[in-house]
Amino acid sequence: NVPVVAKYRRSSTSTSTEHTIYRIKEYAHGLQMDDMVALPEYCTRLDVEPLQKLPVAAVRDIPALPPMSEWVNLRDLGAKGDDMTDDTKAIQDAIDQYDVIYVPQGWYKVSKTLRMRSTTKLIGFHPFGTQFRLAESTPAFSGFGAPEALLESSVGGTNILNGIGINTGAYNYRAVGVKWMAGQASYMNDVKFVGGHGGMNKPQARSSANQQTPGQNVGARQQTPRISSPTNPVAAQGMDLAWDNQYWSLWVTNNGGGTFKDIWTASTYASHGLYVNNTRTPSRIYAMSLEHHVRAEARFKNVENWKILCFQTEEESREGTQCQPIEMEGCRNILFANLYMFRVIRINEPY
């Protein structure tokens, strides 16, 4: 019973309806034109459909976070988040004991795969200030072989990953940032996959071995090659051999899915920002930015029943001249809306 549809403060007037239960089919208030040659005029248009009973509430794609009374603080359970202490055991022990874990701001060093239970929720509030990180050449993620995830979801669970950055470094050749196999009701939100030549940290000072040679332009593309890392990348075109040497940053597989919102996956060290394969679970992407890869920003293989909204790819001139924005194979029932694919103006070759 809401008879007043809208109330206008400036005019102290309102738009109302006589119906007790109704659906608004059209509402417009302000300067309007009936067609391209009509004179504009201020008016209010309201079209309501009376109903006999309230409709069934729509199912939300975006779940609410658990109440804070259920949260446990990861620091209180022994994790340091100082980017020096190996926090793997403290984090895994917390996951094994508790469902909802608050991860305070800090950089948490990890040396083995973290595995979520079916009910695990990991909650941070800043995907750069709060990171799970690999040190360079971490043994469990190095050498040759099958992909090894820094963080692995449960299979078919209701996992949540919120507000946490994932950093697999530059020289961890088997690394995957997140392997996601959780179910339709799972949720990943506000996650940054760290790496490449973009970042928010203060650049490290150059060592004497990395100083410019006589006649070399400071800051130019012809700078001396350096050992790369996400905190101090080689920015010159073609000079960073660490690019494109890892597996995918975000891997959705094994019938995994859910809702993915506000994801920034731009690690140049990964082969793809997103790889989805072998899943028919109905899933949604809301606002994902994929940038700065060498071979492809996103790849879909044997995927069905996905809605991909506000998907943005970007190829950079330094590493992305040969990069494809999206590769698809064996896919069905995939919806793209508000898709935005672009290459920076500095790229001098077409797709």
Predicted regions and their residues:
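All-beta strand scaffolds that present successive hydrophobic residues in beta-strands
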Residues: 1, 122-125, 160-161, 186-189, ...
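Extracellular "leader-to-stem" segments immediately downstream of a signal peptide or signal-anchor
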Residues: 1-100, 127-162, 166-170, 174-177, ...
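Short, T/G/N/S-enriched strand-turn elements that build extracellular solenoid repeat scaffolds
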Residues: 91-95, 106-118, 122, 151, ...
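Beta-strand cores of modular interaction/reader domains in eukaryotic scaffold and signaling proteins
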Residues: 102-104, 121-123, 133, 284, ...
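Glycine-centered loop/turn positions within well-structured domains
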Residues: 130, 296, 306
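Short linear interaction motifs
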Residues: 169-171, 280, 285-291
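Beta-rich catalytic cores
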Residues: 246, 270, 294
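Surface-exposed beta-loop-beta
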Residues: 262, 267-273, 287
